[in-house]
From Swiss-Prot:
The gene is recF. It comes from Nostoc punctiforme (strain ATCC 29133 / PCC 73102). It holds the Pfam family SMC_N. GO terms for biological process: DNA replication; DNA synthesis involved in DNA repair; double-strand break repair; SOS response. This is DNA replication and repair protein RecF. InterPro entries: DNA-binding_RecF (IPR001238), DNA-binding_RecF_CS (IPR018078), P-loop_NTPase (IPR027417), RecF/RecN/SMC_N (IPR003395), RecF_2 (IPR042174). It comes from the Bacteria. Belongs to the RecF family. The RecF protein is involved in DNA metabolism; it is required for DNA replication and normal SOS inducibility. RecF binds preferentially to single-stranded, linear DNA. It also seems to bind ATP. It is found in: Cytoplasm. Gene3D superfamilies: P-loop containing nucleotide triphosphate hydrolases (3.40.50.300), RecF/RecN/SMC, N-terminal domain (1.20.1050.90).
Length: 374
């Protein structure tokens, strides 16, 4: 797949900017806070309808404006598509494909695929479980767009159940409380089981690919293991088994949930365990080794998406070369070559050899404006 054009209107610090991509690799050069990352974020939003910055739509709309719009033309083996995402300061976002409004956002997902790799991704190793869950969910949305709907359903039930626990614990008698809670329990178990099974399947597919990349980058001196640790332990990934285990655990934690007024059971408490040589990665070795792990994860994402969608996704590298030493930079640049269309942000061109610079489109970014290399 090849991103041909991108048009940003009133998005972040861009007033009205059109970019035409003329090479497999585009390097965006500029000082910090000029808008380089904002451009990559716009592409990520078209691919996943999520931002790794976890911002609200109103923060994406330029100050003083009511709406922001991201528009792109994308060439795939099946033909050229025109994608539009409209963000509103007050109100719901909307999407359109080839000029036609799309009601279900999951029908928009999967048209453009992209893998984002930024310095924030180092938190995958160092940070808490929520960051790893978000990372896995973003990958899953691209592998299986219906997952966005599945996750939305689960989160909706979770919010409702939490509200019920907070609101009614003190006001209802025991019989009414348990009968009403049983309805929410059943819905939580049904929707949660769908999330668990897909996360489990995704990790089973990703783990061996990431381990192979990790062995290659580390010269086979370190063994990476990725394990999915669902909050609901079950022997089998069969839906009935998982659902039953879910309901059993809810019963076990019922008193604690009533006491704390929140849901303590479900995939919103899952963990993805990363270990190097059987030691938790966050405790293991240097920042360099942690960066190797994240690089292996990102290369595995690229490979897995390509295997599933049968076309190479875009790669978005946000100021990440500065975070990698020379050997890891070369590993990454060698893996990319011209296989993936790549957008790279950097503050200077010193990280690239002359061959790379010759084969790349170089754009300069200053205060929300993009100037080609003249």
């Amino acid at each position: 797949m090849y991103l041909k054009t991108l048009n940003l209107r009133q998005f972040r610090n861009y007033q009205d900017q059109k970019v035409e991509f003329t090479a497999a690799k585009t390097i965006l050069v500029g000082n910090n806070a000029q808008g380089k990352s904002n451009l990559l974020e716009a592409v990520e939003l078209l691919a996943t309808l999520r931002s790794h910055r976890m911002t609200r739509d109103r923060d994406l709309v330029q100050e003083g404006e009511a709406i922001a719009q991201i528009n792109a033309t994308l060439e795939r083996q099946t033909g050229v598509s025109d994608l539009t995402l409209t963000l509103r300061r007050n109100g719901r976002r909307s999407v359109a494909l080839n000029g036609e409004s799309i009601r279900r956002q999951m029908d928009f997902l999967g048209v453009l695929n992209a893998v984002q790799f930024s310095s924030l991704d180092l938190d995958l190793v160092r940070g808490g479980p929520e960051g790893r869950r978000n990372w896995l969910d973003t990958l899953l949305i691209q592998l299986e767009p219906v997952y966005a709907h599945i996750l939305q359903q689960y989160n909706h039930v979770l919010r409702q159940r939490n509200a019920f626990l907070k609101r009614h614990v003190e006001t209802l008698d025991a019989t009414s409380l348990h009968s009403e809670l049983a309805v929410w329990d059943a819905q939580l178990a049904t929707t949660g089981t769908r999330v668990i099974r897909r996360r489990d399947r995704a990790i089973q597919r990703l783990a061996p690919i990431a381990s192979a990349w990790h062995a290659s980058i580390s010269g086979s001196t370190e063994a990476l293991q990725i394990k999915y640790l669902p909050n609901i332990p079950s022997e089998d990934n069969h839906p009935e088994e998982v659902q039953q285990a879910f309901l059993v655990k809810i019963q076990q934690r019922a008193i604690a949930e009533l006491h704390q007024g929140t849901t303590l059971v479900g995939p919103h408490r899952d963990e993805i365990e990363l270990t190097i040589n059987q030691t938790p990665a966050r405790q293991y070795g240097s920042q360099g080794q942690q960066r190797t792990l994240v690089l292996a994860l990102k290369l595995a994402e690229l490979q897995l998406i390509e295997e599933v969608v049968k076309e190479p996704p875009l790669l978005l590298l946000d100021d990440v070369l500065a975070e990698l030493d020379l050997s890891r930079q070369n590993q990454l640049l060698d893996a990319i070559q011209d296989r993936f269309q790549t957008l790279i942000t950097t503050t200077h061109l010193g990280s690239f050899d002359s061959q790379w610079l010759k084969s790349s489109q170089i754009l300069f970014v200053k205060a929300g404006e993009i100037i080609p290399n003249l």
